[in-house]
Amino acid sequence: MGFADVWVVAGPPGVGKSMVADHLLALLEPVPALLDKDTLYGSFVAATLSEAGRPPGEREGAWYDKHVKVHEYGGMTAVAREIRSRGCPVLLCAPFTQQIRDAARWRSWVEELGGGVVRLIWVRSDSVTLRHRLERRGSPRDAGKLAAFDAFVTRMQPDTVPTAAHLAIDNRQTARVSIEEQLRAALDALEADFRCTGGRYRQAW
């Protein structure tokens, strides 16, 4: 049995990844197993930060990357590989900022996932939309981001296209097409490509 497909929904915190993932799950058949970083690790991260005396809203930076993020992403990758090796597709939902902005790192990560078909869906935003969404959801996790918002935007680059091949889903306030319509159009094009080539995909994303 070969490795099943992986769908990666990526983008900055607060950009609307979970919403995009929900729409995508409703359109895919078979339905992938969803691995959402916040669902998997949210309470564990909060406990780790508290025990280490770190700010409760800390979700990035050198300390976080070394002591927390490496284990979050390492765990998600290992579980995704194990699930898809049994023939079940997987949908990963997390920022994956470093992976999507470095082509070599992306290729290496795809291999860690088991290779095969790994499709990146990047949720596009901008600073105005991002601030609005972070303020509206009112999560303690976002306190540090809002306190130094300009620096956060500079790091996250919500409107900068990833290096890795991807499908962009526009979730800015100015978007004229709904998320579901964007996804449907992309999946329809993917299916048409598959039929035209006799069961082979030409599209990179």
Across the structure, where does each feature detected by a protein language model lie?
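ATP-binding Walker
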Residues: 15
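Hydrophobic anchor at the beta1->P-loop junction of P-loop NTPases
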Residues: 9
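Conserved phosphate-donor/acceptor-positioning beta-strand/loop module used by diverse small-molecule
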Residues: 113-135
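Walker A/P-loop
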Residues: 18
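Conserved substrate/cofactor phosphate-moiety recognition/catalytic segment
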Residues: 22-74, 81
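Glycine-rich phosphate-binding loop used to anchor ATP phosphates in small-molecule kinases
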Residues: 64-114
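P-loop (Walker A) phosphate-binding loop of NTP-binding proteins
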Residues: 12
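Small-molecule kinase domains that catalyze NTP-dependent phosphoryl transfer to phosphate-bearing small molecules
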Residues: 136-184, 188-205
